């Protein structure tokens, strides 16, 4: 086994993950800014890269030399789901340190000005006056629903037998296809955070003392989570919105009833990031636009090209599940 053989077993989302890890690591290494987590960030990215190669070797290549080796199910889960762990517990939290590596918070004033023009007053004052406590709680529930929604759609594609075995591009998309799209949307948003840095209204306008919302258990849950995982930056576009729309848009072709049943929740989630003042209004709009651009790009350049080359059957080994991966 050599690195070239190992590289051919990487799926697109594995390569996107490794590419993003080392793009940001190189930015940090060569940045003139004083970044006190520089060494920790580079070492953690190197460790994640090694993990990806090791887990792929043990799940997909070790059996070629050890004929009777069958990777346990938990090991396959770690191999297939690893990007969601990095999004949740590592990468997003780095933006407090990454967001100003290239540019200042130049677009914030335009985002703030648009909100003032749209509402005729500071939005947090409008929200406090016009949104009742039950509305705040509804928005908090919608904001929280991002987590079970993303994991739920991902689990559907992972557990669906048709999604595992389908090879016809007009049929059910596979788990790997879905993860490729999800990771592409995550990493694209992360790059946009670096190219167009902006802080949330709570940070840019110092709303901690001014914004007094009255909600229920979901609002307090979200507020507690934000106290621990909130980052300074990563506002434009909203990845919360973009990734949700990307996930739900995959249901359009084959599961239209599910798509429409989720749409009220998705619309509420899109609005919630503004009502709770974790984002500007344009962040939400940009998140939706970004998701539709991703969907157009995927259909135009990935699916259509694969169909033209293979006559409707996918044949890219890096993006296909191996025989041992999901069975």
Language-model segments: which ranges?
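Interfacial segments of alpha-helical transmembrane regions
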Residues: 77-85, 151-196, 204-205
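Transmembrane alpha-helix/helix-exit interface in multi-pass inner-membrane proteins
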Residues: 93-109, 185-211
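Membrane-interfacial catalytic/cofactor-binding modules of polytopic membrane enzymes
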Residues: 191-254
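Interfacial helix-loop-helix junctions of multi-pass membrane proteins
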Residues: 200-204, 235, 268-294
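Membrane-interfacial alpha-helical segments at the cytosolic side of multi-pass membrane proteins
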Residues: 152-159, 241-259, 289-298
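N-terminal transmembrane-helix/juxtamembrane module of multi-pass inner/ER membrane proteins
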Residues: 3-50, 75-150
């Amino acid at each position: 086994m050599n690195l070239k053989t190992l590289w051919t077993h990487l799926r697109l989302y594995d390569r996107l993950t490794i590419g993003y890890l080392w793009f940001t690591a190189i930015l940090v290494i060569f940045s003139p800014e004083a970044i006190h987590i520089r060494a920790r960030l580079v070492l953690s990215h190197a460790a994640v890269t090694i993990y990806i190669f090791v887990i792929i070797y043990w799940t997909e290549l070790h059996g070629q030399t050890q004929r009777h080796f069958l990777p346990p199910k938990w090991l396959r889960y770690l191999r297939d789901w690893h990007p969601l762990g990095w999004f949740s517990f590592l990468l997003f939290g780095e933006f407090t340190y990454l967001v100003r590596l290239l540019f200042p918070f130049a677009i914030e004033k335009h985002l703030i000005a648009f909100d003032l023009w749209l509402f005729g007053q500071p939005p947090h004052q409008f929200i406090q006056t016009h949104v009742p406590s039950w509305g705040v709680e509804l928005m908090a529930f919608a904001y929280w629903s991002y987590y079970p929604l993303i994991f739920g759609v991902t689990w559907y594609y992972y557990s669906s037998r048709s999604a595992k075995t389908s090879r016809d591009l007009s049929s059910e998309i596979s788990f790997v296809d879905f993860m490729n799209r999800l990771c592409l949307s995550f990493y694209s948003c992360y790059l946009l955070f670096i190219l167009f840095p902006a802080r949330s209204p709570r940070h840019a306008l110092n709303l901690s003392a001014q914004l007094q919302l009255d909600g229920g258990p979901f609002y307090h849950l979200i507020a507690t989570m934000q106290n621990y995982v909130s980052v300074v930056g990563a506002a434009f576009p909203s990845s919360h919105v973009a990734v949700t729309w990307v996930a739900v848009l995959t249901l359009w072709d084959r599961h239209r009833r599910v798509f429409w049943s989720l749409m009220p929740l998705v619309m509420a989630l899109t609005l919630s990031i503004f009502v709770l003042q974790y984002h500007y209004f344009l962040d939400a709009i940009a998140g939706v636009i970004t998701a539709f651009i991703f969907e157009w790009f995927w259909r135009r350049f990935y699916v259509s090209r694969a169909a033209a080359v293979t006559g409707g059957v996918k044949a890219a080994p890096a993006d296909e599940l191996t025989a041992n991966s999901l069975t």
